[in-house]
Amino acid sequence: MMSLNLAHQTGAAAAVAPAAPRTAVVAAAAGTVSAPAVAPAAAPSLQLQTQTVDPAAPAQGPDLPMAFQALVESLPEEQHPDVGGEERRKVGVPVYVMMPLDTVRKDGNGLNRRKAVEASLKALKSAGAEGIMVDVWWGIAECEGPGRYNFTGYMELMEMAKKNGLKVQAVMSFHQCGGNVGDSVTIPLPKWVLEEMDKDQDLAYTDRSGRRNYEYLSLGADAMPVLKGRTPVQCYGDFMRAFRDHFAAFMGNTIVEIQVGMGPAGELRYPSYPESNGTWRFPGIGEFQCYDRYMLSSLKAAAEAVGKPEWGNAGPGDSGGYNDWPEDSPFFRREGGWNTPYGEFFMSWYSQMLLEHGERILSAASGVYTGTPGVKISVKVAGIHWHYGTRSHAAELTAGYYNTRHHDGYQPIARMLARHGAVLNFTCVEMRNHEQPQDAQCRPEELVQQVAAAARESGVGLAGENALPRYDETAHDQIVTTAAEKAEEERMVAFTYLRMGPDLFQPDNWRRFAAFVKRMTESGVRDVCREQVEREAQGVAHATGSLVHEAAVALSN
């Protein structure tokens, strides 16, 4: 078996169709690349709401309603959070709730709908939620220039969460908001980054037809000093360090998790199925994103390293289009090119590039957050369940997950996370097979089981999310079954509910949500009496009625 040398190299390569696959045996890709850890910088005064960091330097409310107040005061002692940071052991699964995408204003200087946020946090606390998840947008917090950080609006939110006894999962969102499922607002990358992408369009992921994607910087340029003297990975590391220093007083007590964005929608994947401008529609197979000159240069070097230079000119020329199905494409059909020596070579390279990207950013994150007690690092992996029942798993392959009938694509990811002690956050936990279009061979349940097994075998904590907004008991039942109704060692370490908004605070939805949270977090989940849970949830809904109504109205405006 020949090994691939996947070292990054610069230089352009012609984007022409590759030669027909040859009969040769190709090995799995070479080992991962680790970025060196960097010594942390001293924390600045928390009184300063806006930070300016030299990029050239070394990388380093209103009172509660009486009924709600009585409800909180009546809770047993052990149910109150320890804001000081000492978490008590819980048997169930803690539930977090995603904040609206536009929680912080685009200028970064405050919160949108502040009164709604305040009422919402109090309501979530009353329902037993552990905390919230919020996107810390690169395009907001470092918008004005390299090293000029503005966390003012996020500081306001952290203080509000702490006051209400809620924990925070902070997402380092290095991607654009807009263009993916559920994106209701648009928050582009920092304007100084977009200026560099305009000068060098190969910094954007590119498909076979030359279409550029500006959601996230191409991983092919990870190690290139293309952002005013810094590499993208250095920019990500500097941003995370600035966040850590600015929120030092909240780390480990209020901020308990840093989810590190690694691609579109914050997920470790390629932007193979962009919804913007109708490019992709479910359940299309998507397209490979390897046609910027940095990616093509790496592909060329990898092909030469295995003695097959003709394989290094471009990706598969017969892999179809965004909205095709596997059988439409010679590459993805039952015995197609994916299952040939050429296909194995290409998929090994393509998926290994994604793994190395994750390794580099995780190394940077570990260098920043290692030694910060009480703070976990997590990485989000996409739940691409359509065409999972086919042999080629085409939609997973174009996204960078080399998962087929013959090859496990999630074990390598889990092992990478294990090296850094990171949590694997996975989506589509709420889905059942029979709810999906059967002709697309969707298998969300089997996919979740496969990822859970990979996490378990690698010793990695598994956390979950619902991929789409769901407020019905059927979805809640599926989440409870998948995440909580298991032996303790197989339970998810956390679940994040998508998403806070006016629909969540509709009376029936809110009552069902309160019952769901109780089922997830109660000790001995399988022994919980459903009728008792419903009664208690009704009590929460009644006690928080005015608060929830206020939140629903404010969030609708």
Curated annotation (Swiss-Prot):
Substrate binds at D135, H175, D183, K380, H385, T427, N466, A467, R499. It is found in: Plastid, Chloroplast. It comes from the Eukaryota. The keyword Amino-acid biosynthesis does not apply. GO terms for biological process: polysaccharide catabolic process. GO terms for cellular component: chloroplast. It holds the Pfam family Glyco_hydro_14. Keywords: Carbohydrate metabolism, Chloroplast, Glycosidase, Hydrolase, Plastid, Polysaccharide degradation, Transit peptide. Residues 1-38 form a transit peptide. InterPro entries: Glyco_hydro_14, Glyco_hydro_14_CS, Glyco_hydro_14B_pln, Glycoside_hydrolase_SF. Possesses beta-amylase activity in vitro. May be involved in cold resistance by mediating the accumulation of maltose upon freezing stress, thus contributing to the protection of membranes. Belongs to the glycosyl hydrolase 14 family. This is Beta-amylase 2, chloroplastic. It comes from Oryza sativa subsp. japonica (Rice). The gene is BAMY2.
